[in-house]
A protein has these predicted regions:
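Juxta-kinase regulatory segment immediately upstream of eukaryotic protein kinase catalytic domains
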Residues: 2-29
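Structural motif at the C-terminus of the N-lobe alphaC helix and the adjacent alphaC-beta4 loop
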Residues: 82, 89-98
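Conserved protein kinase catalytic/activation segment
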Residues: 164-176
Length: 331
């Protein structure tokens, strides 16, 4: 097939891949179920049971070969024991304050089910909000601050898409799940962290409607807040070539490549000028809620003599200038 470029700067291969290979690639991804997932109730608490399939190790090795050939910096945990250790350890590190995780059998990890729904579900139902995106960004930033011996540095997820972010509407808290994938351990922490942001943002790029996607991306990046990582993200916002493009197709739900390319360009501009965007947003917020110059900090209780409340009270009690101070008395 010729590999020239059209007017939009897209190769002919990239134009035909969504139409010719999207269904096949989607089927392949769906069939690539390294682990099976089920739910049960144990001791009156619902648990998620993740079990490594019989051919899971071979499938993981096959996927890792594709990642390596395509220069995609992630891999599956192919060995069952390694996966169980990593899955349980990450879940406990991030969610062990409220929820338990335990091994059950040689190929199984059991995790208490987190309350809420994934941001992926909210996005597809049209119920995704900016508050949810802020909660996700705060949780990812929190997770990135944990030290991990496997990396000999800060931890990263490796697959931080919206399907793996659970949001609890009652508490307003987001939590991360699903730790089957790990980043290449040779990568610097900022590169790994930027890749986590990229994976999350590609869901927004591929699915969210035109008028919402950029404000959503801005809200997420502002809430994440680490400008060094966001600067590194700018270097990763370009459509890849060759076989790596198929994985990006999966990440963006095989959205139109021209649309993805245009949105990535806007994201690059956003990341390059995020500091300016944040300054403008802060100024607007200050203009909307200017503090009164007559308000003073005070402790609860009796108002001070100089306070505005007491001054108003005294003024209300004062006699009018035209009113005599005493009523006339009869003699």
């Amino acid at each position: 097939m010729p590999n020239g470029k059209n007017g939009n700067g897209l190769t002919l291969l990239e134009r035909f891949i969504p139409d010719g290979l999207s269904n096949a690639a989607t089927t392949l991804v769906d069939s690539l179920k390294i682990n099976s997932i089920s739910e049960k109730v144990r001791r009156r608490r619902r648990v998620v049971i993740k079990r490594r399939n019989i051919y899971g190790e071979q499938l993981a090795d096959l996927a890792n070969l594709y990642f390596r050939i395509s220069s995609i910096p992630i891999r599956f945990w192919s060995k069952v024991d390694d996966w169980r250790r990593w899955e349980a350890g990450c879940f406990k590190m991030l969610n062990g304050d409220r929820f338990r995780v335990f091994a059950s059998g040689k190929r199984t990890v059991c995790e208490e089910k987190l309350p809420g729904k994934s941001l992926w579900d909210h996005m597809n139902r049209g119920t995704l909000t900016r508050q949810m995106l802020e909660a996700a960004a705060h949780e990812i930033r929190r997770a990135h601050q944990f030290w991990n011996d496997e990396f000999d540095g800060p931890w990263s997820h490796g697959d931080a898409g919206m399907t793996n972010v659970i949001y609890n509407q009652r508490t307003g808290r987001a939590r991360l799940i699903d730790f089957e994938i790990i980043h290449d351990k040779s990568l610097p922490a900022t590169v790994r962290h930027a890749d986590d942001l990229l994976v999350f943002l590609l869901d927004i790029v591929g699915i969210v409607p035109g008028q919402q996607w950029l404000p959503f991306a801005l809200r997420f990046l502002n809430a994440y807040g680490n400008l060094d990582v966001i600067a590194e993200l700018k270097n990763q916002l370009a459509l890849p070539n060759g076989m790596a493009w198929i994985w990006w197709g999966v990440r963006t739900s095989f959205a139109n490549p021209a649309k993805v390319k245009k949105r990535l360009e806007k994201l690059r501009d956003l990341t390059a000028n995020l500091r300016r965007y944040r300054t403008v947003a802060v100024k607007r917020a200050r203009q909307r809620r200017r503090a009164s110059i007559s308000c003073q900090e005070m402790s609860p209780g009796m108002p001070r003599a100089s306070s505005r409340t007491l001054a108003i009270s005294d003024k209300a009690k004062a006699a009018s200038p035209g009113m005599p101070r005493r009523l006339p008395t009869k003699r």
